[in-house]
């Protein structure tokens, strides 16, 4: 690559000649564009061409040299023109404060009693949509409870709940288009549930049987569905963010009427991939909605030990990304914010960051005991007094769309369906152990063949170390 560029007169001319990017690498009008738009401006915004952006781009050195004197004469006396941007100057030495004196407010629509706050700005939700949202939130609660108990009974090896974050799961999913591509972390099964992933499919993945789309190779809760535009979950934290920027950019290049949506927790923002993903999406103006679940805890690490900034929302502005802080326990606020962000990302071809303020009621996973690092009273308070499902239910009931009879019937049916799904998943055979060595290379190399043979010999020598009915 370096040799190729060295042979070119300039980087720009090289790209133009070799990649046919003459329409991209042109001078831009760097005049100020408004950060915020009125409703009428947003509604009339045309679809932006992938190559019609206003972002700053490099120009040829020779072009800069030819017009240097002219540029200096034209620059306002109060501004300095640097390659990094045109900026004003001051004779006063003043450091930017580490934070604003006032914290960024949190957008909400419903109060704690499920009543709409007067003069709230939100997108109306129909009875049909509201009822479905609540049904899915309640089903997610039941699913989490039963799978968690199944792990405690030794029927599955691992589980991780979304207790306390049901509104973020379901309301955000409801605000998206089925064509939008989701790159999740590991606490968003509700998004997949909303899109049509069945309870049987959830159970098959958790049990790692032959019906599991991942062929039993992944640990439980690492779901994925190509059919539902839901990338398979990966364990490494934050790797999905740069990937989401790339997927979003590909949607932009293909002029798709869709965006990428990716999730991460507050702890994940300490990973380098968080910053790389945001910067990548901002520079390339990729239609990506970044949703951060700020639930206060990164396993046992409190947010006070994660960052000193005003949460996550302020990090978006640093990368040139529009951002908003939302009450993640308010389903109406989550729905309105995500739907608005989604429209902004698609119509304006830009990334958006949403910080969802919430609380992780459950343990980090079945491998964790959170009472060792936080008070039981604190957990109970958020479980009972700040429960997002109960809060949304009050609003649905106040509208006359839900009753106690509906509640009892829904939870009873969900429980029966889940128990049946678990029983069916247990009856499926497990994948043979040698399946581990397939789908890695087109032609299996000698070293893998040797490892496979060694594993077979080990199982033969020590069969007591493997469960009954285990297939090699």
From Swiss-Prot:
Record's keyword annotation contains Acyltransferase: no
Enzyme Commission identifier(s): 1.2.4.4
Amino acids binding K(+): 234, 239-240
The keyword Metal-binding is assigned to this record: yes
Gene Ontology cellular component terms for the protein in this record: mitochondrial matrix
Entries under Pfam families matching the protein: E1_dh (PF00676)
Stimuli inducing this protein: By dark treatment. Down-regulated by sucrose in a hexokinase dependent manner. Up-regulated by Leucine and its derivative alpha-keto acid (KIC).
SUPFAM superfamilies in UniProt: Thiamin diphosphate-binding fold (THDP-binding) (SSF52518)
Description of how the protein assembles with itself and partners: Heterotetramer of alpha and beta chains.
Protein name as catalogued: 2-oxoisovalerate dehydrogenase subunit alpha 1, mitochondrial
């Amino acid at each position: 690559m370096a040799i190729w560029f060295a042979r070119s007169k300039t980087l720009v001319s090289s790209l133009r000649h070799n990649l046919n990017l003459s329409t991209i690498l042109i001078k831009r009008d760097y005049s100020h564009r408004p950060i915020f738009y009125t409703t009428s401006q947003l509604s009339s915004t045309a679809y932006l061409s992938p190559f019609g952006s206003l972002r700053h781009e490099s120009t040829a050195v020779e072009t800069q040299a030819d017009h240097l004197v002219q540029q200096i004469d034209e620059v306002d006396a109060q501004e300095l023109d640097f390659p990094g941007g045109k900026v004003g100057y001051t004779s006063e030495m003043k450091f930017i404060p580490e934070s604003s004196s006032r914290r960024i407010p949190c957008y909400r629509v419903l109060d704690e009693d499920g009543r709409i706050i007067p003069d709230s700005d939100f997108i109306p939700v129909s009875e049909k949509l509201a009822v479905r949202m609540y049904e899915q939130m309640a089903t997610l609660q039941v699913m989490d409870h039963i799978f968690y108990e199944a792990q405690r009974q030794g029927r599955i090896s691992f589980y991780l709940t979304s207790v306390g974050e049901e509104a973020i799961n379901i309301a955000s999913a409801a605000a998206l288009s089925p064509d939008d591509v989701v790159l999740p972390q590991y606490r968003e099964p509700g998004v997949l549930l909303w899109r049509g992933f069945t309870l049987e499919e959830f159970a098959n993945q958790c049990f790692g049987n032959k019906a599991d789309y991942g062929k039993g190779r992944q640990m439980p809760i690492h779901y994925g569905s190509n059919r539902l535009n839901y990338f398979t979950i990966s364990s490494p934290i934050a790797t999905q963010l740069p990937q989401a920027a790339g997927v979003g950019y590909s949607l932009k290049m293909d002029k798709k009427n869709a965006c990428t949506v990716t999730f991460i927790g507050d702890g994940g923002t300490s990973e380098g991939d968080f910053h790389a993903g945001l910067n990548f999406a901002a520079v390339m103006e990729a239609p990506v909605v970044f949703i951060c679940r700020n639930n206060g805890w990164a396993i046992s690490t409190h947010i006070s030990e994660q960052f000193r900034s005003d949460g996550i929302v302020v990090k978006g502005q640093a990368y040139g990304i529009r951002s908003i802080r939302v009450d993640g326990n308010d389903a109406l606020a989550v729905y309105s914010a995500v739907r608005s962000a989604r429209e902004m990302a698609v119509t304006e071809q830009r990334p958006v960051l949403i910080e969802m303020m919430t609380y992780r009621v459950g343990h980090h996973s079945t491998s964790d005991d959170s009472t060792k690092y936080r008070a039981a009273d604190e957990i109970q308070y958020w479980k009972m007094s700040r429960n997002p499902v109960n809060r949304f239910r009050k609003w649905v009931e106040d509208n006359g769309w839900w009753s106690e009879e509906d509640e009892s019937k829904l939870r009873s049916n969900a429980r029966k369906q889940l128990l049946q799904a678990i029983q069916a998943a247990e009856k499926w055979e497990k994948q043979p152990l040698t399946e581990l060595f397939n789908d890695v290379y087109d032609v299996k190399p000698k070293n893998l063949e040797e490892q496979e043979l060694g594993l077979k010999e080990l199982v033969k020598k020590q069969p007591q170390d493997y469960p009954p009915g285990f297939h090699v």
